[in-house]
Amino acid sequence: MLKFKNRIVEKRVKGAEKASFGGPVLLYRTLRKVTKLYKYITDKKSFPILVTSLFALFNPNSVLAADKYSNFEELKENESPLSYNILTTDVDRRVLILAPHGGGIEGGTSELARELSKSYSAYLFEGLRIPGASELHITSTNFDEPQALDLLSKHDLTISIHGYASSKKHTLVGGTDREKAAKITSLLTDAGFSAELLSEDSRLAGTNEQNIANKNSTGMSIQLEISTEQRREMFNTFTLAGRNGTQNQVFYDYIAVLTKFINENVYCMAGVAP
């Protein structure tokens, strides 16, 4: 998906290079845009918004435009406790399943985390507000809910589960533990799932040290970005209320891959029976 976007951008740039930049019509349009921009900048009310927007545009680690809240404290102060739910389980320190955008934020990630929490430590933040669950999204580099930070500090490896928008059945695998990320990618493809290992500098790789997944005891993580269509295929009813209880064979096959990976590459390598 990312490569596809990059290709589109490149084509647009090339097209612009070939375009004619002369002519009175273009000059007239340019002057109009400059005039409007000047009026916008000199408006005292608009200036702070413009500065914030430019900062967000040129700073990839800043709050995403879609985020209503820049941290958990802001969310807590403005939202009813009934609009979200937090689940934690602490089994042992070897691995923590992390789903900070569960519920209606990135649909299907809750159910995956809950299923894995039956065997492993887990942290799950769920947006329950309908409509508007997406407003409870806090980007991973700003996610600082206290229970999450506390639980992470007690664990060695994080497997974070996210969702990204795509009509293709696909999983993007990232994280700071490149060796384990490559292994889980292979296991997914061997099981018939479409998956690819992202480069470390990819936007969805989750390698930023400020990413919540990397704030464990070692800084080692694996990040799974699962497409909308892949998550949809795991349930007979893909709604916030309908997903629970409608998990199908695709869901359990995906869980089986993650379980196999953890048991063989985390527990067995540590000399401990899962």
UniProtKB/Swiss-Prot annotation:
- The signal peptide here is none
A Pfam family the protein falls into? Gamma_PGA_hydro
Q: Which Gene3D superfamilies match?
A: Poly-gamma-glutamate hydrolase, zinc-binding motif
Q: Which GO terms describe its molecular function?
A: hydrolase activity
What family does this chain come from, according to its entry?
Belongs to the UPF0714 family.
**Name under which the protein is recorded:** SPbeta prophage-derived UPF0714 protein YoqZ
